[in-house]
Amino acid sequence: MSSEAERWLAAVVGNTHVRWGWFAGESLVKVEQFPAHQPLSWPEETELWLAAVGSAPLPPRSPWVHCLELSQVPLRDPYPSLGLDRALALWAAGIRYGWPCLVIDAGTALTLTGADAEGSLVGGAILPGLGLQAQALADHTARLPKVEWDPGAPIPPRWARNTGAAIRSGILHTLLAGLRDFLADWRRRFPQGPLLVTGGDGELLYPHLRPLDAELRWDPHLVLRGIAGCRQLHRVVRKPSGAE
């Protein structure tokens, strides 16, 4: 099989963005992100494997389009309403880095999801992410501005002296304090095993969490890696035309 035939696409379809991952076989070679309202288009006769985790419209069904479901992710003991993105990220983390493992996915919602040494779901937590907390203050107060987050900016002072810095301080310091508490509890239960940070805000949070644990890693593409793993398990190998 040629390298061109091995190229395929994975997509994580959310509420606000679609993240594309170009693969050559099992290797992730390129990642792109587009607004969710933009119509999905890709080269003809290219496999597309989708994880729909939001309300954005999906492409029509075709032999080239595969929409993954929670039941296709070989994570042990998931509950029925577990988010597909959480399951894919956790399973990908476990098979790539080892079990037990904990994934902190810092997206629109920030989630913590953990599995034990057998790859069985332990459970997790969901809370508003950095952007959602900032947006809530801007939307539901009369005079507080909407603040933006810069991964390269220093952590704001705890006792800020202007409104924007005070908002960043309140959100970031309380979020980090909560994550420290969750990580400490996880380590009491599972003293060994990797901890993974992923998601759009993970780049900002990771430097502040990294000193807490030697096994903490940053992997921005866990959900795409999970899609690739499921493709390996479930894809139908097409025979060349005329083959018996």
Curated annotation (Swiss-Prot):
EC number annotated for this UniProt entry: 2.7.1.33
Q: Which reaction does this chain catalyze?
A: (R)-pantothenate + ATP = (R)-4'-phosphopantothenate + ADP + H(+)
List the active site: D85
Cofactor comment: A monovalent cation. Ammonium or potassium.
Question: Which residues participate in K(+) binding?
Answer: D105
Q: Name one GO molecular function term.
A: ATP binding
One GO cellular component term of this record is: cytoplasm
Residue stretches spanning the membrane = none
Cite the binding residues for substrate.
Answer: Y79, G83, L84, D85, R86, T163
Q: Which GO terms describe its biological process?
A: coenzyme A biosynthetic process
Q: Which InterPro entries match?
A: ATPase_NBD, Type_III_PanK
Q: What's its top-level EC category?
A: transferase
Cofactor dependence is on: NH4(+); K(+)
Keyword entries, A-Z:
ATP-binding, Coenzyme A biosynthesis, Cytoplasm, Kinase, Metal-binding, Nucleotide-binding, Potassium, Transferase
Residues where ATP binds = V12, V13, G14, N15, T16, H17, V18, R19, T108
Its subcellular locations are: Cytoplasm
Q: In which pathway does it act?
A: Cofactor biosynthesis; coenzyme A biosynthesis; CoA from (R)-pantothenate: step 1/5
Pfam families xref list: Pan_kinase (PF03309)
Tell me the subunit arrangement.
Homodimer.
Which family does this protein fall into?
A: Belongs to the type III pantothenate kinase family.
**Function, as annotated:** Catalyzes the phosphorylation of pantothenate (Pan), the first step in CoA biosynthesis.
Name of the protein in its database record: Type III pantothenate kinase
Q: Which organism is the protein's source?
A: Synechococcus sp. (strain JA-3-3Ab) (Cyanobacteria bacterium Yellowstone A-Prime)
